[in-house]
């Protein structure tokens, strides 16, 4: 069907059946929306279908979001599609011509049991907001299904599981050719840490801060969205929709396209490094080497063997900087709420025996994917436990408000009897002279020692012994001690790898510690 015929078909459909579509919009899924319908007045339902097409409103540009400069805004318009007349057909034609687009969705519990209200589709220059609550399944039959199932069009989505389930079971649509930014984040994390996996996935906000380095203040719309949903889970059913909500819908889809590009760049960093080495293999080497090299030699070149060394260095780096939970997954630092970040900004925090300034950076926590990696994790655990057994004074004190869930993600199990004995021994170590730690002292010997303590000179010597043999109670083990002992740094002879030197600047760990 040609473009002109398609537009004429949509226009004819709208003129003939607009009345039935409008009637259906007021009672879409009566069973699912019975609760919100009881709260709304009858006159509110009459404005669900505006008489004139919804106006186009400016949204923040994709390029401007990356510049972080409000004074240099480059506007990209978003268009609300809430009826088939005029704009629906033109929007479908524009989207069909794209190779890559981003898709987001909003509604009440978006899955097979929930209700899809909005479907946001963004291209490089425009954002379309399809009001599925008003348009109904006819919107998919008249173009959207064809786009969502098209294997030639790449759809960028953050966590596609829920939308895929909803489209499949409610509309019979099989979502195809998807680039999921949540999956890509885990894959990039595994590559960056030499094969480890994180203990959790990231939200859209966390992904934007980490990979696009977007300042949290530019992502306030995501916090506002979450707050609105908590206050009123049926906020997406309300008509007419406020401009602030429409902007939130547009920005959700807008950020996904540059996020995909950033993730691709990070995942391709190894390829770029190895190719650069390939380019310089012969042209910067001696000419004598070329005479003895067979062009048909298929052995793995030395330049590509560096990838093995890269992965080894990354595993060692990750083991020094992250904690591992009971499942062998490295604990990822969770982005703190904006309020906590503001309260602690500019202050130095005492973290496990060290003072870190506000510019302190640390990577996230990964986990192994193969059997060899699981063996390395077990080795790390054994070394950590051995260190704790031989050096009880390094055990960090347990905080009173610590939950069992947090403790389950640590190598030191606070519930075990052995650990409790170690903590008791540690406490006594801080409060007791060093010579009192000797085992199997008789009652007579203990009495004699107590009498000796009463002597002023002996008491003075005892205090000196305590100060030299024990650590202060506030001293905590550093993150690197959680894995294995300190080793001398070996200067690598390998060429620099950008992925090895990358440190996430957005993470400020242990913000909740005093």
Curated annotation (Swiss-Prot):
Annotated compartments: Cytoplasm
Alphabetized UniProt keyword annotations: Cytoplasm, Meiosis, RNA-binding, RNA-mediated gene silencing
Organism superkingdom: Eukaryota
CDD domains named among the record's database cross-references: Egl_like_exo
UniProt-annotated stretches for the region Disordered: 384-422
Coiled coil: none
Major location category of this protein: cytoplasm
Domain notes: The 3'-5' exonuclease domain lacks the conserved Asp-Glu-Asp-Asp (DEDD) residues that coordinates divalent ions essential for exonuclease activity.
Stored PANTHER family: PIRNA BIOGENESIS PROTEIN EXD1
Assembly, per entry: Homodimer. Component of the PET complex, at least composed of EXD1, PIWIL2, TDRD12 and piRNAs.
Purpose: RNA-binding component of the PET complex, a multiprotein complex required for the processing of piRNAs during spermatogenesis. The piRNA metabolic process mediates the repression of transposable elements during meiosis by forming complexes composed of piRNAs and Piwi proteins and governs the methylation and subsequent repression of transposable elements, preventing their mobilization, which is essential for the germline integrity. The PET complex is required during the secondary piRNAs metabolic process for the PIWIL2 slicing-triggered loading of PIWIL4 piRNAs.
Protein name: piRNA biogenesis protein EXD1
């Amino acid at each position: 069907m040609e473009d002109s015929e398609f537009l004429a078909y949509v226009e004819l459909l709208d003129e003939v059946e607009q009345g039935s579509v409008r009637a259906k919009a007021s009672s879409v899924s009566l069973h699912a929306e019975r609760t919100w319908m009881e709260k709304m007045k009858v006159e509110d339902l009459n404005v669900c279908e505006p008489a004139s097409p919804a106006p186009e409103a400016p949204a923040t540009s994709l390029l401007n979001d990356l510049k972080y400069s409000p004074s240099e805004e480059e506007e990209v318009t978003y268009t609300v599609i809430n009826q088939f007349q005029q704009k629906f057909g033109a929007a479908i034609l524009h989207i069909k011509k794209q190779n890559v687009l981003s898709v987001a969705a909003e509604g009440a519990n978006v899955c097979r049991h929930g209700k899809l209200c909005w479907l946001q589709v963004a291209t490089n220059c425009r954002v379309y907001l399809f009001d599925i609550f008003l348009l109904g399944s006819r919107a998919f039959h008249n173009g959207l299904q064809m786009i969502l199932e098209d294997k030639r069009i790449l759809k960028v989505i953050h966590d596609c599981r829920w939308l895929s389930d909803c489209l499949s079971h409610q509309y019979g649509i099989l979502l195809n050719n998807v680039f999921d930014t949540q999956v890509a984040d885990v894959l990039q994390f595994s590559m960056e840490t030499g094969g480890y996996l994180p203990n959790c996935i990231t939200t859209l906000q966390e992904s934007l801060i980490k990979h696009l380095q977007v300042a949290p203040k530019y992502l306030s719309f995501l916090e506002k969205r979450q707050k609105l949903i908590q206050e009123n889970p049926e906020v997406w059913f309300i008509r007419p929709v406020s401009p602030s909500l429409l902007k939130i819908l547009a920005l959700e889809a807008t950020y996904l396209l540059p996020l995909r590009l950033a993730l691709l760049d990070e995942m391709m960093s190894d390829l770029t490094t190895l190719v650069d080495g390939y380019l310089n293999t012969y042209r910067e080497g001696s000419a004598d080497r070329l005479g003895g090299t067979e062009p048909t030699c298929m052995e793995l070149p030395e330049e590509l063997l560096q990838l093995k060394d890269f992965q080894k260095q990354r595993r060692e780096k990750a083991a020094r900087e992250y904690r591992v939970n009971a499942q062998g997954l490295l604990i990822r630092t969770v982005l703190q709420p904006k309020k906590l970040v503001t309260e602690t900004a500019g202050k130095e925090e005492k973290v496990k025996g060290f003072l870190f300034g506000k510019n302190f950076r640390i990577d996230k926590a990964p986990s192994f994917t193969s059997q060899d990696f699981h063996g390395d994790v077990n080795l790390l655990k054994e070394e950590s436990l051995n260190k704790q057994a031989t050096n009880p004074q390094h055990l960090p004190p347990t905080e009173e408000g610590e939950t069992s869930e947090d403790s389950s993600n640590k190598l030191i199990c606070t519930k075990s009897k052995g650990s409790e004995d170690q903590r008791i021994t540690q406490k006594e170590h801080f409060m007791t002279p060093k010579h009192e730690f000797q085992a199997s002292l008789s009652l007579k010997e203990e009495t004699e020692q107590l009498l000796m303590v009463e002597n002023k000179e002996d008491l003075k010597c005892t205090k000196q012994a305590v100060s030299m043999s024990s650590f202060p109670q506030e001293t905590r083990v550093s993150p690197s001690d959680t894995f294995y002992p300190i080793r001398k740094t070996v200067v690598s002879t390998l060429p620099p790898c950008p992925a090895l030197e990358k440190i996430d600047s957005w993470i400020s760990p242990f913000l909740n510690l005093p």
